[in-house]
Amino acid sequence: MGDMTNSDFYSKNQRNESSHGGEFGCTMEELRSLMELRGTEAVVKIKETYGDTEAICRRLKTSPVEGLPGTAPDLEKRKQIFGQNFIPPKKPKTFLQLVWEALQDVTLIILEIAAIISLGLSFYHPPGEGNEGCATAQGGAEDEGEAEAGWIEGAAILLSVICVVLVTAFNDWSKEKQFRGLQSRIEQEQKFTVVRAGQVVQIPVAEIVVGDIAQVKYGDLLPADGLFIQGNDLKIDESSLTGESDQVRKSVDKDPMLLSGTHVMEGSGRMLVTAVGVNSQTGIIFTLLGAGGEEEEKKDKKGVKKGDGLQLPAADGAAASNAADSANASLVNGKMQDGNVDASQSKAKQQDGAAAMEMQPLKSAEGGDADDRKKASMHKKEKSVLQGKLTKLAVQIGKAGLVMSAITVIILVLYFTVDTFVVNKKPWLPECTPVYVQYFVKFFIIGVTVLVVAVPEGLPLAVTISLAYSVKKMMKDNNLVRHLDACETMGNATAICSDKTGTLTTNRMTVVQAYVGDVHYKEIPDPSSINTKTMELLINAIAINSAYTTKILPPEKEGALPRQVGNKTECGLLGFVLDLKQDYEPVRSQMPEEKLYKVYTFNSVRKSMSTVIKLPDESFRMYSKGASEIVLKKCCKILNGAGEPRVFRPRDRDEMVKKVIEPMACDGLRTICVAYRDFPSSPEPDWDNENDILNELTCICVVGIEDPVRPEVPEAIRKCQRAGITVRMVTGDNINTARAIAIKCGIIHPGEDFLCLEGKEFNRRIRNEKGEIEQERIDKIWPKLRVLARSSPTDKHTLVKGIIDSTHTEQRQVVAVTGDGTNDGPALKKADVGFAMGIAGTDVAKEASDIILTDDNFSSIVKAVMWGRNVYDSISKFLQFQLTVNVVAVIVAFTGACITQDSPLKAVQMLWVNLIMDTFASLALATEPPTETLLLRKPYGRNKPLISRTMMKNILGHAVYQLALIFTLLFVGEKMFQIDSGRNAPLHSPPSEHYTIIFNTFVMMQLFNEINARKIHGERNVFDGIFRNPIFCTIVLGTFAIQIVIVQFGGKPFSCSPLQLDQWMWCIFIGLGELVWGQVIATIPTSRLKFLKEAGRLTQKEEIPEEELNEDVEEIDHAERELRRGQILWFRGLNRIQTQIRVVKAFRSSLYEGLEKPESRTSIHNFMAHPEFRIEDSQPHIPLIDDTDLEEDAALKQNSSPPSSLNKNNSAIDSGINLTTDTSKSATSSSPGSPIHSLETSL
């Protein structure tokens, strides 16, 4: 059989690649078709064709133990024959395609048409042209030369349209290039572990070749197809390819097929790589998706698939999963593997593509548009907060612009016809028709000009520039942004749910305490004090029952700490062995990994790991280690001082917990219990019956492992809290350990009112009798929850979802989450921003995340917040500037056209203004670097309008100044400067000095206003930090230089006439007035301008003092801020005291006995400090109609201050009691949705 297949296959091989005749014993096609089989089918095929997996290894000239020799020629040959492990990216759009796309802009198309008509008419000389009888409504005749110049305006409009298009296309092109760079960086970071020449090495995924022996472990995303050759308890989530959500158990004799793009959910093992790149299962799907190319894009569904499918431009195994995900979504059963998205959300998400106008140009290497991709992975976010607000604003402005331009055209046409045919009683002569048409075209161009200026085309540009700039800079701050909008969403974050290990701590585990042989050692015990039997068991238990890939290596530099490789907890235990002056290597070489009989790997359900070995006498021994409270429950014996097992009763266990484990945990140590159990050789136990096997253990020792808090974390958390962001810690550790670490980090402060819950208790509280999660139950818990311990990934997801869906606070919460494990995927996807760990994170977590923290450090998250807020501010600055220009230009063009029948600002000039104002200003204002002061204000949240009242004040204030001066110049300018008036000039008259001065002054005012626009919170010093931004200075000076050229040499095309020096001085002087005027505006207190409140505001339920605080605190400097805050606190206090006096009798009721007396000043301060605890005490502003209600309400409010008598140490049980007693009693008074809900936890 073997011979036949061999010869048969050689003939095929000759056909396929004659040059590589007998290189390897199987062809690419054979392996590819083998990988398409599943389960038993595949096992049968392997047996029939090859014999077994080892035979395939021999044919591929590789060793299951040693791997490939790893020589360059061999690897090269394999790449040539079997292909490289990378999928070619979709071709980037060419510059011409981008130009074509930029031309699709509607306003530009209208302008092009107008310009072409204008050009055509200027070359057409109708017979009645010289006819005196035709319209002379404009007064004054043209001389010959001028008539010739009619074409200039049309040509100039076309030219400026081309400029705008080229600039847009160039921006898109550079952004795409940058994005590809980012993508390739993500790829290079993607590494995988293989065995070459007997050494375990990590290589980039692209370097993997057929025949490699790869080591797979929990959390990996398989980068290629392969056959399982050895391992333990390996379970794979194949839903990305098959749509089946059950995990598939892999074994050599039942199902050895490992497929690229699938996730390792449990266990570890080795695989022989059999297909890479386009020949792997994921690669085949990609090729199918990419094949249809452009036609598919048109069809919505397929376009979506393709967008995601081609996300993998190269070897990036991680990106593959997204593709595979979407492929699964679209190809298999249309069901996303993350079933947590409810219908309403997915609707919101589907609209994303339509609304995400800013992201349009971003055709990234990640395939399709960014928004295409978002549509595809439905489980990704809804439209980002900023995009939503911008889209809304752009639509509103666009509508206003359309209306204005239509009115302008109608008025001009009516004015002309009435003036010509009614007032002057001119007859309509056929030969005059072309002349009239020319007038109408001119009016139409004026109308379009108004529209062009009204629509802020610069908005999407400003957003993309700002985001792209931030993303680039964030790389330096260790934030690798995968989804552009995550960067801006981060600025709005109100809550961060962070992992403990590795993010808040250094993830360098060391054993510092131990309990061995009935003695609790507060430091590493002296080896001689431990019984030799116990010592031997301990060394074996640690060395064998931990992943063999975990090692402690000598330090790289002299005097540095030893390097920890692999699982950090296991490294801590191995370090303990070394500290006991023992060595674990001999034990491992005696009992190599292949000889391990059975392994129960660690997972979030078991919370322990066990390994079974066969002893020389054929009996079995199982070593176990895991979280002490879990493993101790399974122990029935414990080793005493003499190394003999003694009975370990529940009573002893409780005592041990009290005396050993709790003190360790309160020092912030993780406690790990190491145990063992012996089994007889016959009858052999049923290894699949885990409950019986993992029981009746004998405890060897309990160790306390320290994972020190990163030194920079407490400061970072303080910054977050100051910035109004609540930090919560979600960890799998014991509650005492978690609380101790939370206090060290500054997440909780002793004496505060907060909750620390265990996963079980959390679940008990949020579920009703039927076991369903209720949002209002979550709402009672999350505002105070600071630590969630012993939590499963599901708890994390539930918490994140609960906070995001909560309508309990004024502003809907924006939540960021950090995660590193495979099972953090759902929480990372659900969060508004998901952070994955770059070093410790699994591929699966990185895939689900929006931002990768390349240094796993919490303080990098604070940097992300800073950048996010900066993006928001940059866009607000640009908006403030842009809208001022728009308001002024539209009003000038509109009134000018209506009064003088001609716009003082010509179409070409408007386009120039539009170009500099839009493109350059967006560049200048969008690249302001962030400052620490950004972290001194509260998050904007979801409902805050883009244009605050201060900005509105600035926009209108500057518009008034500019309009006043422009109209002054328009109507009395000729007298001021003693020049000819430019009003009512005939059709093709030469440019006048008068209108040139108006244009020049207009541009000068914009230039100086650009400096004003740098500050949007009412700061006085607009020059602050201006030299830190060279781009800004360059653009302002550059624009000024170009303006000089346009005015002095622009001539006809720009309708400019050269100006004298004194005229220039006046223009600049009026422009400088902007800066002075800016100071005047800053002096007007925003709080007085109540009428501005409506602008751009979405919802507003706050009461007045609070709103003052929110609005003004951001907009006045800090000294004033403290003063203002003091006043408001006083008002607040007085208000509250009034209410309390009114209802003082209510406090005597038994319900509230024993609780604290009315709040002290500090508790009022506490209310202020935590935005999410703010209570809407709007009662004082409401006429007292329903007394009873108010009394109860006020009474509750009275007690809402943290009662310090209770809950000092804040154990979960304590607060549990408070909660239950209260809820039962206050149930009567709280109707769902009332603010009282927020208080129940604190009573």
UniProtKB/Swiss-Prot annotation:
It comes from Homo sapiens (Human). This is Plasma membrane calcium-transporting ATPase 2. The modification Phosphothreonine is found at T1139, T1188. It is a multi-pass membrane protein. It is found in: Cell membrane; Synapse. Its EC number is 7.2.2.10. It catalyses: Ca(2+)(in) + ATP + H2O = Ca(2+)(out) + ADP + phosphate + H(+). GO terms for cellular component: apical plasma membrane; basolateral plasma membrane; cytoplasm; dendritic spine membrane; extracellular exosome; GABA-ergic synapse; glutamatergic synapse; intracellular membrane-bounded organelle. It holds the Pfam family E1-E2_ATPase. The lineage of its organism: Eukaryota, Metazoa, Chordata, Craniata, Vertebrata. Interacts with PDZD11. Mainly expressed in brain cortex. Found in low levels in skeletal muscle, heart muscle, stomach, liver, kidney and lung. Isoforms containing segment B are found in brain cortex and at low levels in other tissues. Isoforms containing segments X and W are found at low levels in all tissues. Isoforms containing segment A and segment Z are found at low levels in skeletal muscle and heart muscle.
